[in-house]
């Protein structure tokens, strides 16, 4: 999603978010990621000012103190950025890819099922189709990507081939590199 993102050309405008809308965003995040309930006020303090950045292709970025913490495509779900995920990685559903998939993952490739179901990978059974998950790598501590599952964990384990997770945002992509003043 962010391979071709260019912060100088794609950003069309910024708007401060009202506190009532900010509460709604926090509620949507907690609904989508229930484990965030305990830490949501630390991640997005009540008196802080969220800013919405409108970009090309109906993409919205949400920043806090100049740091992109959330993004949303059109009316889709609000998705945490890796910068937010690194602050509380245990609050999100995680999968792990084996060592062989790391270089492909960090170059923006989609995650293939064999990298998830192999010995070094980890694919929890409760993952459903069209669910956003955090992708970690074997032997690494920090989350490396955020992806959207293309099928359930059960289906992935049965087929054992093809694309399992669409790589939406990864370490080193243009969203990760974007620094706002």
Swiss-Prot record:
Protein name: Translation machinery-associated protein 20
Protein biosynthesis listed as a keyword: yes
Record's subunit section: Associates with ribosomal complexes.
This protein's record includes keyword Cytoplasm: yes
Family: Belongs to the TMA20 family.
Organism of origin: Schizosaccharomyces pombe (strain 972 / ATCC 24843) (Fission yeast)
Gene coding for it: tma20
Cysteines engaged in disulfide bonds, as pairs: none
Subcellular locations according to the entry: Cytoplasm
Domain PUA: 92-172
Lineage: Eukaryota, Fungi, Dikarya, Ascomycota, Taphrinomycotina
């Amino acid at each position: 999603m962010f391979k071709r993102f260019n912060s100088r050309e794609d950003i069309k405008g910024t708007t401060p978010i009202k506190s009532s809308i900010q509460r709604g965003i926090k509620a949507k995040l907690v609904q989508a990621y229930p484990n965030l309930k305990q830490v949501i006020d630390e991640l997005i303090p009540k008196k802080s000012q969220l800013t919405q950045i409108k970009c090309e292709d109906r993409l919205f970025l949400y920043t806090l103190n100049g740091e992109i913490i959330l993004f949303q495509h059109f009316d889709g779900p609000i998705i945490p950025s890796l910068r937010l995920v690194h602050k509380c990685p245990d609050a999100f559903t995680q999968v792990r890819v084996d060592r062989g998939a790391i270089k492909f993952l960090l170059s923006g490739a989609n995650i293939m099922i064999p990298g998830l179901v192999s010995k070094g990978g980890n694919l929890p059974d409760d993952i459903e189709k069209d669910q956003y998950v955090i992708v970690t790598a074997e032997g690494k501590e920090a989350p490396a990507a955020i992806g959207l599952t293309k099928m359930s964990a059960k289906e992935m384990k049965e087929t054992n081939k093809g694309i399992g997770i669409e790589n939406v945002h990864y370490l080193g992509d243009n969203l990760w590199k974007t620094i706002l003043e």
